[in-house]
Amino acid sequence: MEEEVQQHSHCVNCVSRRCMTRPEPGVSCDLIGCPLVCGAVFHSCKADEHRLLCPFERVPCLNSNFGCPFTLARNKVAEHLEMCPASVVCCTMEWNRWPVSYSDRKSYESLSRDADEVSQLDMALALQDQRMLLESLKVATMMSKATGKISKPREQISVNSSVQEVPRANGLVSADEESYGALYEATVETTRSLAAALDILNSATRDIGMLNTSLQGTTNEMDEESNRESSQDRNAKDQDHLDEGEIGAVGGIDYTGTSQNAQAEQNGSSDLLCNLNTSSYDTSALCNGFPLEKMCTQVKDQDQNFHGDSTESNITNGDCVEADGTSEPPSSLLVAEQLKEGSALPDSTYQHILMPDEDDDEDLCWKKDLGDSKDVNGSPLSHATSFKFLSNSWYIPKEDKAVDTSDLEVAEDPMGLQGIDLITAALLFCLGDSPGGRGISDSRMVDVYHVDFGTQTFSLPSAILATNTMVGEIASASACDHANPQLSNPSPFQTLGLDLVLECVARYQPKQRSMFTFVCGQLFRRKEFSSHFKNVHGDIHAGLNGWMEQRCPLAYYGCTYSQRRFCPSTQGAKIIHDRHLRSFGVQPCVSTALEEPSRNCVLGLRSDHLSSLPFEVLQHIAGFLDGFSLCQLACVSRLMRDICGSLLQSRGMVILQWGKKKYPEGNSSWQIKEKVWRFSTAFCSVNDWKFADILSMADHLKKCSYNVIEKREEAIPLPCMCVTRELTKEGRSLRSVLKPVL
């Protein structure tokens, strides 16, 4: 370009169509017109520049990198973009459904019984959403949840022995037989319906809030009592107090010699003896409020086993541990430790109670209720040797290994899963994996360590489904090629487990965790999207709750009758739903004259007169069909498939499929794997709707088998008729009956 400018210094600034300058080498050149006859006149040296601006120059489509094969004039690009096969729009319309409650299960089973024979739009859409929901889940024989997050310590200490022990219905395994039995019965009852899953989630969330509120109130009371301590305990104000969430179970890891010496120097004494008596006993010596120098413990054997029968160990004259590790004579009162197997508090917290010893009235023993819990490795929880809390390491070194909870020895199928259908079980465990649901393990704090406890003890059937996503994040792609079924053994799943009623919740509004959200996800050409959104979501979806598809008022009792109240303005056309395309469509009216010859055809004779037409004629006829009809026509025969394939560039759309390519160096990148051509599921636009010519619903109620009239001819006395009443000539009057009451 620079050479041209140097050679033609005149042409650089010349824009006149009537330039009279004579051509001179290196100065100017001749004037020429546009070869494509766009009307432009310019110097011949500017021909390449004009091609960049000429409106008649043929250029590839702007979406050529996305698969559009068309090359067209520059002035036709804007018009082409409206029908460009690569200009694809994805519909992001969302709707929500509630799971079917337990009380409605029977009625929904009867409604789903004849779903294939009776074409009901609301039932077809609900079953489609259910299939897409189940296909989006993963098949698993054991429900697993791989979470890398660190759970907060859930060990809490209570100072009141009268805390109400409410069994938590969150899937935790309790060691107490009574509480576990109640939890087992509640779990068996709740898992038989999807509504029970909602109760599990709600009750779990509510119990957590109530427990936290109770513990916070208890902590405040202890702080107030600690401020009113007697003068005997005022020297302990500068001591370090342990936080309630950090104490965990009684008995932590052993002190090192350095930590013991530092603690002894801080107390001003080399021993850790305490002087307690029953007269000065108050809540300040408990939990959050007690000073460390008042606590003396007896060294216990670390190999002591606490599971099995409950045992008590009352030691009133044990030796105190000094800073140097030696023992002193029993010159003062020691705090003994009494371990007893008892019922666990909600959330598996440990309850510590300070109570007098039976052997010595002046002694106080520390009683601890520890459930027979087991960690995921199967070993029983071993109690530490003494009350030693200070530590810089709060976590046990972890390692990755495949474990299960079979060592908990819970009976097979404890939740009664064999009594419910696969759909209810799949949706139940889908809810269980949501926030507040059941996990396979739970991290708790025991002996100042975080230990993972098993919480799921049942093996799921091979067809039970589990998911790694939250409930609110599960999306249903309604397009034909969008959802890739992941079921190894697919089944029809005809029993409806989702509510027929669609719930619309704005995106900025919070949704219930037990509500399933579905996304349309269909792909359309840009010019087809407006009609799809108006007809499908604005007209059909909005009318499924009683306007377009009107059900019998007795449908709750099992009546499956329904009628289509609205239909397109075209005479005889009706709305249908195709299960394979997962989309709605318009079926035009078929004349009875066209159906008669097919009934009289003799087997063996050629009755397909349409296929005998020339290819060009068939191609012209197919050009008048919409995308929904072309998808149906392509499944008729190979000839019709070839005809529809010839219309893909003009009527179809192209979708890019990406694949991950790995290089020898080790890095990878995403590249276009292939370009897929297909038709959209859009149908011809319906501008007007009209009422269908059908009978009234009252005519159906006259012969509805569920409309049983119950005549009550026997008089039913009022509650107040049991008292003394006056009699009149006509008999018992209501006024006389009510008079004594008034």
From Swiss-Prot:
Superkingdom of the organism of origin: Eukaryota
Gene3D superfamilies to which the protein is assigned, alphabetical: 1.20.1280.50, TRAF-like zinc-finger, N-terminal subdomain, Zinc/RING finger domain, C3HC4 (zinc finger)
Sequence segments annotated as region (Disordered): 214-242
Domain F-box: 607-653
Record-linked InterPro entries: F-box-like_dom_sf, F-box_dom, Fbxo30/Fbxo40, Znf_RING/FYVE/PHD, Znf_TRAF, Znf_TRAF_N
Record carries keyword Ubl conjugation: yes
One BP annotation, GO: chromosome segregation
Residue intervals of every TRAF-type zinc finger in the record: 49-108
PTM characteristics: Auto-ubiquitinated. May be neddylated. Neddylation may be required for E3 ligase activity.
Basic and acidic residues: compositionally biased ranges: 225-242
Signal peptide span: none
Pathway assignment: Protein modification; protein ubiquitination
Function of the molecule: Substrate-recognition component of the SCF (SKP1-CUL1-F-box protein)-type E3 ubiquitin ligase complex. Required for muscle atrophy following denervation.
Record-given protein name: F-box only protein 30
Organism annotation: Rattus norvegicus (Rat)
